[in-house]
Amino acid sequence: MRQLRALGIAALILAAIFPLQSQGKKTVLQYWSWDSSVKKQNEDIIAKFEAQNPGVKVELTTLETTEYWVKIRLLANQGKLPDVFNMSSGYLEEWARAGLVRDLGPSIDRDLDKKSFYMSVLDAGKDIAGTGKYCALPYALVTTVLYYNKDMFDKAGVAYPSASWTWEDFRKAAKKLTIVKDGKTQQYGFWFFGRYSNVESWVFANNGRLIDPATNSYKPDANAIEAMRFLTDLVLADKVAPAKKEMSAFRYQDVFPQGAAAMWVDGSWFIDNNRKIAGDKIRWDIAELPRGPKGDGKSVYGWPDYVSISPNTPNADLAWKFAKFVAGEGVSLDMYMAGKIPTYRPITESPAFLEKGQQPANKGLLIKQAAKAFRTSYTLGWSEWRGYGPAESLGLNGIIDAIIDGETSFDEGMNKADTNINKILKRYYK
């Protein structure tokens, strides 16, 4: 962290050393993207931008996510960041505190068409950055939803989830949807494990929090504890959801579309996966999460993907103009996999976004959620303490998995989480 901060200062010094980047008479912008699946769409956006801005050349670098973060961190350490680059919610605070992203607040105040963007999403980024500044411009967001198998609901005679569902309604439905024959469970009512999007969705639906923002410490409140106990009880007491180890034959995202469970809570981006895996073999839809006993329904668990601007770009105004274009009027719906929500409202609120005739029929729910306040648990070191990606078996993810796998008690797991996670956070927030 201190290394990145020092290098952020170095980057500003380098800005005074290196002259305006040019190619002949053209002003050159460097744009880095982590998504090779939309390389062609990005090239189309760039072509439109260049046509509207004669004398400008945008050079695109596209890398897969893992390689992207390795290489862009190297550039940050060298003070050679591209003018505009993709930024993740999971790393925004680290980069903002290190001074490696430009403060966009003055530009947003000056000429961003706020009516055309979901400002709640921009505000979420401001909160995640932890600096009180807008350090990135969101171009897409995701939320979490309740996926449910309509065929299984119909067969069990259970009414589809509604906005009035309570946690007890959910539990009762999960029990009716669980099928046991000869002592073996053939179909579960629900599926989850310690994954962040599986757990925090319920924490926030109960108006809970995991992180104390005043101390940057892991200190789950009573509402969060209630949510995590509710989830683990679905496995250990109600027997309506499996232990994680029981589903080891599946990719976690395939348990629901392959028909092993009737309900599942995860990111809206899995709409795309469900379509590919399930096809037309099952009828399914999405609903909002049941509101917890302490929930008020005013916020939703969700987070954006962004573009950020280098603090030492010699072309700050032009970089801002391009960032607005790539997050707004320059994009088209085919830039987004099903389930990702454009932050540019004219696209999201167009009839094409609803994809009538395709599952899920209730895709309009995502538009309603985009207008709500967003909550997350992102901090410095989030992937480490949460147990994300390569660290999945560690952190809170691993602890919750151990609870539902019967390897530790709930109270023992919560105590372990408190000790281990706060050791990690203390390293980052000194």
Predicted regions: what they are:
Residues S36-K57, L396:
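Short, polar/charged alpha-helical segment
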Residues K25-S36, V56-T61, V84, C135, ...:
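Short, well-ordered beta-strand elements
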Residues A47-M119, A124, D154-G157, V255, ...:
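Extracytoplasmic "Venus flytrap"/periplasmic binding protein-like
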Residues A173-K176, A214-K245, R275, L289:
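Glycine-centered hinge/linker elements that transmit conformational signals in sensory
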Residues S89-V145, D285-A287, G357-N362, Q369-A371:
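Hinge/lid segment of periplasmic solute-binding proteins
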Residues A129, G364-N420:
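C-terminal capping/gating helix-and-loop segments adjacent to ligand/active sites or protein-protein/ligand interfaces
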Residues L74, D83, L112-M152, Y188-G189, ...:
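A structural signal for short loop-to-beta-strand junctions that line the ligand-binding cleft
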Residues W269-D272, I309-P390:
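Mature extracytoplasmic/periplasmic domains
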